[in-house]
């Protein structure tokens, strides 16, 4: 498949430059979000009369077929494509002909990848949040089951004051509650739809940005098109929140290791969760 931008150049691109620019080996993880976003875009194009409703239906059905085939393993990624967007469009055009080329109307890969990233990270936040809630519930259950159990409290691994085991456990519950708050705040700021920003300054097509935002579960649209496609602060914010979460989990894990050691003997771990 020719490059989307091939019409702007006349010479051959170096294979070294091609390999350097290729991102499909890692952005293939975005396939589900890329296809879901494209289905919403096709629906919007049809609703706005930019393409016919019949063409929109063909595009949506074709995209669903690609998603199904990727999920089942019937279709494999072509790592010769530059990125996940070009791979999906290539397969769609092979299956539908010229109708497949209309999918990219009123859209750029700039706002497309910004959309994919936000959708992917929102999904990741939802998964992480569910797991943290499971850990939190387990900690609270252990605290409830061990009310009244007294243990030494340590500073610098020196016994300092007697404390309740449940009180020590609930310290981690408090940390995880703050972690959940950070994840939720991050998701809220991330939940802004950039689609329609195009390369950086929108499009002359009569698009409906809110149509796509609603269809994809976003709370709002990006109010500035340059900000919508160019900034990745939401990625850094999530990395910060997850780093703090992992620090808390690492700290808790180290406590469990100490408590289960021969020197402490405060707890016993099931053989199901230990190795030699």
Question: Residue locations for each model-derived region?
Answer:
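Acidic, glycine-rich loop-and-beta core segments that form the ion-binding/anion-interacting portion
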Residues: 216-276
